[in-house]
Amino acid sequence: MISGLSHVSIVVPDLAAAARRLRDMYGLVIGEAKVNEEQGVRLAYVELGNARIELMEPARVDSPVAKFLERNPNGGIHHFCLAVGDVESTVTQLRDKGARVLGDGKAQVNVHGARIAFVHPKDFLGALVELEEHQDEEGGAR
């Protein structure tokens, strides 16, 4: 079901300023920003080899990330993402065990073209969890 950690997501009030700080202070390379229209966020990633740091800022005032910044004006950790082989079967297994999946429960597609779903924080020790489908070239879980 779960094959590893994909990324940790940090909401920031200013994506460009956050990218500069991580570059200047830690020497990290931040990828090009992309917009996820469906979620209303602008994203940029720091590749760390076996996982990523995802930086997010609101792209719309009505996005969940904008609401997060209202409660946390300086930003902070928003969620972490677990890699799974098949989002749909993982969601089904979790629901069968009583977990709540956010939204309509159907997988969405992220800016990388991967299928994703979110598990309610009450069902993972208070943390919002994203499930992201990771497959190798042969279509198997990686």
Task: Go through the PLM ranges and name each one.
Residues 1-2, 71-73:
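Short, flexible turn/loop "capping" segments at secondary-structure junctions
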Residues 1-41, 63:
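Long, hydrophobic N-terminal alpha-helical segment
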Residues 5, 9-12, 22, 46, ...:
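Short, structured motif recognition centered on aromatic/hydrophobic residues
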Residues 12-20, 34, 44-47, 54, 60, 72-142:
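Vicinal oxygen chelate
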Residues 29, 55-69:
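Conserved secondary-structure micro-motifs at functional edges
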Residues 41, 48-50, 72-77:
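Short connector loops at helix/strand junctions that flank enzyme active sites
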Residues 49-53, 60-62, 87:
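Short, charged/polar surface micro-motifs in flexible loops or helix N-caps
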